[in-house]
């Protein structure tokens, strides 16, 4: 047994200079671990609620109430529990909060405790977190979906699509995939400079030039890939996070690239992009509540490309179950803070995999040096991870952890590569 003996919490800063929650767990065997909670800029309406203080302090974004909840309510409830019993601990957290959206104590408070408990149990067991959570079969390193050009809510430009990603699907190892992605990133900087475009960075470390639209952004990235000597499509594919909820208005449609479009017109736009670029994945191509549009889009192009539900599913098993029943999307974006406990996150992943949906582990735009999602990606065999550009330490921390995991696995390590995207067929 690994009995929880002490629970601590504090307010720290995330990568955008906003407060977030960090939790420490001490076990009776001397184990001491900590976990920090991320926060999003573009958030889904159906996400679990972060508890913020309001008022003037930190522009209302302080988390002292969440910290107080950990110390005054959660700590007495979990002290004495066995950290190895993750599902039991998380159920205590859910019962204690007592709300469907975790708004009383806050998902940021609950998640900090949930993740710190898992880390403590792993360390007490003498196992790395990925091995503790994933067991002996955890051996697949994910494809890094590197957001090297930022728009939408992650940048102060007129680019509507939130993330333009490169996916090094042809690399033989994770180590090589990281090198390829980093080289493309630096090549993109050179391309942007040569055209007199900004090389300032967005929230997730990608460049944030003010370009005309989606096609120009993709063309710039294609030029960067060519500059490295890598092949567009077979070596490095492309992916998008549209975050369409951000420019959708119920009753009028999608205000995208200067015109208001229907779901059908957005679907036609994506279909045309597929014919012009080697895209393996599009995240949130439509709004979180446009179920009819999602079903039609999935029926139209879902056999050719991965369609990822982020705001649509918010890592919530109930919403995912609805989507599976309707035939909406074919992949789940996994963000631990959208749902608020590790157990619920793992349940969502299991449900997705059981129904043939792919999963992509993901960071948030407001990140910390916490590397839990790197271990989680390997533990659940997601085969894909989205954690920003190969720049800024809060992003690189996850990539570096995956390098360590690949080394630890040795000869048993396998890189997911193009197998992670079975719908993608490159004709180039």
From Swiss-Prot:
Pathway: Carbohydrate degradation; glycolysis; pyruvate from D-glyceraldehyde 3-phosphate: step 4/5. (2R)-2-phosphoglycerate binds at residues 162, 335, 364-365, 386. Its main location: cytoplasm. Disulfide bonds: none annotated. Keywords: Cytoplasm, Glycolysis, Lyase, Magnesium, Metal-binding, Secreted. Binds a second Mg(2+) ion via substrate during catalysis. It is found in: Cytoplasm; Secreted; Cell surface. The active site is at 204 (proton donor), 335 (proton acceptor). Belongs to the enolase family. PANTHER family: ENOLASE (PTHR11902:SF1). This is Enolase. The lineage of its organism: Bacteria, Bacillati, Actinomycetota, Actinomycetes, Mycobacteriales.
